Amino acid sequence: MWPPSHRQLCRAFLLVCVFSVISFFLHIHQDSFPHGLGLSILCPDRRLVTPPVAIFCLPGTAMGPNASSSCPQHPASLSGTWTVYPNGRFGNQMGQYATLLALAQLNGRRAFILPAMHAALAPVFRITLPVLAPEVDSRTPWRELQLHDWMSEEYADLGDPFLKLSGFPCSWTFFHHLREQIRREFTLHDHLREEAQSVLGQLRLGRTGDRPRTFVGVHVRRGDYLQVMPQRWKGVVGDSAYLRQAMDWFRARHEAPVFVVTSNGMEWCKENIDTSQGDVTFAGDGQEATPWKDFALLTQCNHTIMTIGTFGFWAAYLAGGDTVYLANFTLPDSEFLKIFKPEAAFLPEWVGINADLSPLWTLAKP
């Protein structure tokens, strides 16, 4: 019997390699996804501003002829698939995104966002979590978990490989250990940052005409909270007395600050905020349909005054610097305190000024 030729040996070796590669991919397909789901990693096409769904790409696949980066990849040590319901408005969804990212990392799971969250956040921020396509979402055997708004021990040891989170988490206790990563995720797109900085660059102090040395962003939440807080939660929103105290706190500590006011109730602000010192400007447009314009302004300021709500929280968290917030804004017996822990909502170094609850005591009298 003739010994095999060199050519035959090469062919045999190539066949073995081909079968090995096929076997490897079949193994990944069977172990990584539930029955019927595809093999590809899902990622958004970042060339689009608001892609409605994910595109499919393999690790290392370029996103386009002009793309310099590849599809975001989860580390090989991560497994499973976690996502979160995109409930609520802009600030709510920022909290859900950050909490999903943090809890998934803590539990060694891969995090994906749903298309609605991508549509809300991607036009504003350079977020990197890949998008879960609707057909994958509908065929995944999810277990659902509603989160409360503070970190708990059980959240550090969740064994479910396919988990869909819900609720309105926006507590620093979930993600503050990843602060720099969260700040990178919520980096503004260049055109929004530049537009906000252009607005701030044109501001002048009213009395002297000088450029301000310090910018203090002021977010005044009104709108639906005017009814929700007193009627449902036995609470108040920030009033003119609170805003005056907060501004005086900054005036005492910073030379020549300017207060950049944004609000979804700008008319009230113009009628009730004292502008006699020439250091207040009403810069926001207050349009709830385009919240990123006001948000970009706030994040480009040095410091923050917030009233209540997740929008103000995130503006302060990303701006850094000093933050003054409205404290004790509900009655002690409010049901709100069952779902909201102030110590988990506001960073320890932030400064709280107590709300005036006298309007609530008046309402409570028979």
Curated annotation (Swiss-Prot):
It catalyses: a beta-D-galactosyl-(1->4)-N-acetyl-beta-D-glucosaminyl derivative + GDP-beta-L-fucose = an alpha-L-Fuc-(1->2)-beta-D-Gal-(1->4)-beta-D-GlcNAc derivative + GDP + H(+); a ganglioside GA1 + GDP-beta-L-fucose = a ganglioside Fuc-GA1 + GDP + H(+); a beta-D-Gal-(1->3)-beta-D-GlcNAc-(1->3)-beta-D-Gal-(1->4)-beta-D-Glc-(1<->1')-Cer(d18:1(4E)) + GDP-beta-L-fucose = alpha-L-fucosyl-(1->2)- beta-D-galactosyl-(1->3)-N-acetyl-beta-D-glucosaminyl-(1->3)-beta-D-galactosyl-(1->4)-beta-D-glucosyl-(1<->1')-N-acylsphing-4-enine + GDP + H(+); a neolactoside nLc4Cer(d18:1(4E)) + GDP-beta-L-fucose = a neolactoside IV(2)-alpha-Fuc-nLc4Cer(d18:1(4E)) + GDP + H(+). Keywords: Glycoprotein, Glycosyltransferase, Golgi apparatus, Lipid metabolism, Membrane, Signal-anchor, Transferase, Transmembrane, Transmembrane helix. Residues 26-366 are lumenal. Residues 1-8 are cytoplasmic. Glycans are attached at N66, N302, N328. GO terms for biological process: carbohydrate metabolic process; fucosylation; lipid metabolic process; olfactory bulb development; positive regulation of cell-matrix adhesion; positive regulation of endothelial cell migration; positive regulation of endothelial cell-matrix adhesion via fibronectin; positive regulation of sprouting angiogenesis. InterPro entries: Glyco_trans_11 (IPR002516). Pfam families: Glyco_transf_11. The keyword Plastid does not apply. GO terms for molecular function: alpha-(1,2)-fucosyltransferase activity; galactoside 2-alpha-L-fucosyltransferase activity. It is an enzyme of class 2 (transferase). The chain crosses the membrane at residues 9-25. Pathway: Protein modification; protein glycosylation. It is found in: Golgi apparatus, Golgi stack membrane. Its EC number is 2.4.1.69, 2.4.1.344. It is a single-pass type II membrane protein. Belongs to the glycosyltransferase 11 family. Catalyzes the transfer of L-fucose, from a guanosine diphosphate-beta-L-fucose, to the terminal galactose residue of glycoconjugates through an alpha(1,2) linkage leading to H antigen synthesis that is an intermediate substrate in the synthesis of ABO blood group antigens. H antigen is essential for maturation of the glomerular layer of the main olfactory bulb, in cell migration and early cell-cell contacts during tumor associated angiogenesis. Preferentially fucosylates soluble lactose and to a lesser extent fucosylates glycolipids gangliosides GA1 and GM1a. PANTHER family: GALACTOSIDE 2-L-FUCOSYLTRANSFERASE, GALACTOSIDE ALPHA-(1,2)-FUCOSYLTRANSFERASE 1. This is Galactoside alpha-(1,2)-fucosyltransferase 1.
